[in-house]
Amino acid sequence: MIEPEFKDGLLPVIVQDYETLEVLMFAYMNREAFDLTCSTGIAHYFSRSRGKLWKKGETSGHYQHVKEMRIDCDRDCLLILVEQDTGACHTGYRSCFYRTIEGDVVGEKTFEPADVYKN
């Protein structure tokens, strides 16, 4: 296995749908998230804002099943191809990239956040 380089303890990750190649999200992994992703086949990330590890889908049930992991030429960025359950974005869209810079919604809404993220 090619060992990634974690700059300041983090590794940028681009996530794409395995079949359509749609870009679903961008996140970071720390070493623990990387190791858990490799060992479980379910994507784990590190939340910079919350300062903690997170298993994608742990709250929503919208897991990312890892099909393939690719590393860039400098070994400092990952591309993960996943089978996405429902939507990747906490706002209810399939992709976090669901709108243009002008504000036009171009993505597919796949769930209502209020129905999923109940306190």
Swiss-Prot record:
Annotated GO MF terms: magnesium ion binding; phosphoribosyl-AMP cyclohydrolase activity; zinc ion binding
Primary site of residence: cytoplasm
One Pfam family linked to the record: PRA-CH
EC nos: 3.5.4.19
Keyword hit for Plastid: no
Positions bound to Zn(2+): 73, 89, 96
Assembly notes: Homodimer.
Protein's recorded name: Phosphoribosyl-AMP cyclohydrolase
Species this chain originates from: Methanocella arvoryzae (strain DSM 22066 / NBRC 105507 / MRE50)
